[in-house]
From Swiss-Prot:
Keywords: Endoplasmic reticulum, Phosphoprotein, Signal, Stress response. This is Endoplasmic reticulum resident protein 29. It comes from Rattus norvegicus (Rat). One of its GO terms (molecular function) is protein-folding chaperone binding. The modification Phosphotyrosine is found at Y64, Y66. A motif (Prevents secretion from ER) lies at residues 257-260. Residues 1-32 form the signal peptide. CDD domains: ERp29c, PDI_a_ERp29_N.
């Protein structure tokens, strides 16, 4: 073991504190502070990473974002673990100093007054990302992603019934839809007791579409989205959020309209 340097013992605690402060104040990579569940990208890694996932949701924002919208993004990024097809990423942009990632800002004609800006890249297509222009709320973005064909394990949603909902909405005849509804009804016996309430809601929506037509999911989404803005208990609000999540399964893939 090397001999101790005179004075080193007394200086160690001070040096440790100073080093800790320096680490805390130093920028964490080119995109600013890292968000758990989101991959920070720059002008080099952006072009390497996007083609490697079927879906990549990229948030373009200031280098050091904060506030309510950033908190929503943090929740979204952590929840993205439920999807095997989706990668959540973020690009921090600065138009002063080193002007970080301005090349990407110019490429996608981003307005810093509109940050955060979200784009969904599909199958490595850099030129035609799908923009998101809805509310920066976890539930709203998740429902929009689901409408774009990204599977997310959202509260209230059941994978088997999500699949049936997709088949139902794409079916071209009333007879085919009735057959899918019956398939869902027959499958209820195999659903866990705790999930039967939500499975039944899928079936109820199918019945409403058969009775009232194609516009039912959209009108019901609008109705519940407006209702949820009212003052109510957290339990009731959570239940309505689950209903919104289930309704999203009945949107055709690629639908551009976002929910509130």
């Amino acid at each position: 073991m090397a001999a101790a340097v005179p004075g080193a013992v007394s200086l160690s605690p001070l040096l440790s504190v100073l080093l800790g402060l320096l680490l805390l104040s130093a920028p964490h990579g080119a995109s600013g502070l890292h968000t758990k569940g989101a991959l920070p990208l720059d002008t080099v890694t952006f072009y390497k990473v996007i083609p490697k996932s079927k879906f990549v949701l990229v948030k373009f924002d200031t280098q050091y974002p904060y506030g309510e919208k950033q908190d929503e993004f943090k929740r979204l990024a952590e929840n993205s673990a439920s999807s095997d097809d989706l990668l959540v990423a973020e690009v921090g942009i600065s138009d002063y100093g080193d002007k970080l990632n301005m090349e990407l800002s110019e490429k996608y004609k981003l307005d810093k007054e509109s940050y955060p800006v979200f784009y969904l890249f599909r199958d490595g297509d850099f030129e035609n990302p799908v923009p998101y222009s809805g509310a920066v709320k976890v539930g709203a973005i998740q429902r929009w992603l689901k409408g774009q064909g990204v599977y997310l394990g959202m509260p209230g949603c059941l994978p088997a019934y999500d699949a049936l909902a997709g088949q139902f909405i794409e079916a071209s005849s009333r007879e085919a839809r009735q057959a899918i509804l019956k398939q869902g009804q027959d499958g209820l016996s195999g659903v866990k007791e705790t999930d039967k309430k939500w499975a039944s809601q899928y079936l109820k929506i199918m019945g409403k579409i058969l009775d009232q037509g194609e516009d039912f999911p959209a009108s019901e989404l609008a109705r519940i989205s407006k209702l949820i803005e009212n003052k109510m208990s957290e339990g009731k609000k959570e239940e309505l959020q689950r209903s919104l999540n289930i309704l999203t399964a009945f949107r055709k893939k690629g639908a551009e309209k976002e929910e509130l």
